[in-house]
Amino acid sequence: MTEFTLSDLEKIVATRARAAPEESWTAKLVAAGQKKAAKKLGEEAVETVIAAIGDDRKNLVDESADLLYHLMVVLNIAAIPLQDVMSELARRTSQSGLQEKANRQNP
């Protein structure tokens, strides 16, 4: 079992985002801007769904890794720390999913 975390990935993305675009895919994606990065995130999301439907475990693992990586890039460009997302998840999971959804729909 690996000890690699999403926090580790966030740090790697932040470091690589500061590199020269010709030296790093992450830097190239960041330099292209949020619209390009978000489009790539959407493509990876679709590929993850297709892998899930296809019942191909290895492909689903691979596409999920791509999806998480591209999410970290999008969050980096938006200057949203992973901790903000984790805090929101913690808040949402402190109650049932149905109650949380009702609260969002009726603030």
UniProtKB/Swiss-Prot annotation:
Keywords per UniProt: Amino-acid biosynthesis, ATP-binding, Cytoplasm, Histidine biosynthesis, Hydrolase, Nucleotide-binding
Disulfide feature: none
UniProt-listed Enzyme Commission number(s): 3.6.1.31
InterPro entries: HisE, PRib-ATP_PPHydrolase-like
Location in the cell: Cytoplasm
Coiled coil: none
Any GO BP annotation: L-histidine biosynthetic process
CDD domains: NTP-PPase_HisIE_like
Enzyme class, broadest EC rank: hydrolase
Pathway listed: Amino-acid biosynthesis; L-histidine biosynthesis; L-histidine from 5-phospho-alpha-D-ribose 1-diphosphate: step 2/9
Main location: cytoplasm
GO molecular function: ATP binding; phosphoribosyl-ATP diphosphatase activity
UniProt record similarity statement: Belongs to the PRA-PH family.
Stated name of the protein: Phosphoribosyl-ATP pyrophosphatase
Species, as recorded: Sinorhizobium medicae (strain WSM419) (Ensifer medicae)
